[in-house]
Regions:
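Predominantly five- to eight-bladed beta-propeller fold
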Residues: 47-109, 137-140, 144-155, 184-189, ...
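Residue-level detector of Asp-centered blade-edge/turn motifs that repeat once per structural unit
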Residues: 1, 40-41, 129-130, 208-209, ...
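Multi-bladed beta-propeller domains
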Residues: 1, 16-32, 94-121, 146-150, ...
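Hydrophobic or amphipathic alpha-helical targeting/insertion segments
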Residues: 11-58
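Conserved beta-strand position repeated across blades of beta-propeller domains
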Residues: 37, 126, 205, 255, ...
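Hydrophobic beta-strand positions that form the internal "hydrophobic ladder"
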Residues: 2-5, 45-46, 134, 210-213, ...
């Protein structure tokens, strides 16, 4: 309701007054909380927790209980600087204003991660405006297929029923076989027919009227440096539109206008990250043309203005308000 500030401290969720007083601990989780997102009605909250996972690494095998080594049996066993011995899962919980309880794992029994490691955060999940649905990002693959694939999808989770729908693939879709020893470019997975999303699909956001979900979308599987497009999905018809195609570069971040017809995004052009506007018809226009970089973007409440950070080679990050 805008009267409290929620924050994480030592792996637990807290709330306080805007002046820093009245700090109250809301959770007492045995597993540390890594991220959170309250529903628009304030009655539910998403909690990110990492669960133990030993699908590819067996630590301290039974016959060597004092060993510190790891027995690796499959990919993917490591992300950059850490071994894959845990996996983040999103939990949805009820909140009565004082305590968080009745937690349910959105991926219960599934050996997948959400948010996606190693860089994903709570921005990979989003509440619908009516607080009944969660859109989340997930790459539902394991082993070698997980390690060589960039094919993540956007899923809709119905909080009441627990049902899940994939917005990127039709029901019953099965991946074609992939030869891990050859380039993905020439394989069948990147030559699909129909409106399939085969690359990275991440960071969903519902439109304010709840009729659309937008997300960043790459076209090809196995191509980590593919161009990030801006995909808009019509929840009533299932139609997808890519509304930033007239901008020949990446969509780095975006947000919806309150009218649910206009979107703002930032992207790099000629070595500068500026701000742009598009609509459901894909009519793109530049809002800024600065020799600086915008690093984040969001709407400033219901004012119709945009709040963004901006920096340059000679200036640290500052917050700016932009009137489109």
């Amino acid at each position: 309701n805008g009267t409290k500030i929620a924050f994480l401290r030592e792996g637990q969720l807290w709330k306080m007054n805007p002046d820093g007083t009245g700090r109250v601990k809301l959770t007492n989780s045995k597993i540390g909380i890594e991220g959170f997102s309250f529903s628009p009605d304030g009655k539910k909250v998403i909690l990110i927790k990492s669960l133990p996972y030993h699908g590819s690494i067996q630590k301290n095998p039974d016959d060597l209980p004092k060993a510190t080594g790891r027995l690796v049996t499959d990919l993917n066993y490591r992300h950059w600087d850490h071994y894959v011995e845990s996996m983040p899962h999103p939990f949805v919980a009820t909140f009565d204003g004082q305590t968080v309880k009745v937690q349910k794992d959105l991926l219960e029994g599934e050996p997948y991660e959400c948010p996606m490691m190693p860089f994903g955060g709570v921005e990979q999940l989003a509440w619908s405006p009516n607080s009944k649905t969660i859109a989340y990002t997930c790459r539902k693959k394991t082993g070698v297929n997980y390690a060589i694939s960039t094919d993540s999808d956007i899923y809709l989770y119905d909080v009441a029923s627990g049902s899940t729908k994939n917005l990127c693939k039709p029901e019953g879709y099965k991946d074609p076989e992939i030869n891990a020893t050859k380039t993905m470019k020439t394989q069948a997975v990147n030559h699909q027919q129909g409106d399939l999303n085969m690359g990275y699909d991440t960071n969903p956001q519902f439109s304010p009227d709840g009729k659309y979900v937008a997300w960043q979308s790459m076209k090809n599987n196995g191509y980590e440096s593919d161009r990030n497009r801006l995909c808009v999905y019509n929840l009533a018809t299932g139609e997808k539109k890519y509304v930033a195609e007239k901008f020949d570069s990446n969509v780095d971040a975006f947000c919806w206008n309150a009218d649910s017809k206009t979107l703002y995004f930032i992207g790099c052009w000629h070595a500068c990250i500026n701000m742009y506007q598009t609509n459901l018809n894909g009519d793109v226009r530049a809002l800024t043309d600065d020799w600086m970089d915008f690093g984040s973007i969001q709407m400033l409440g219901n004012t119709g203005k945009i709040l963004a950070s901006r920096h340059s080679i000679s200036q640290a990050d500052e917050l700016y308000v932009i009137t489109p």
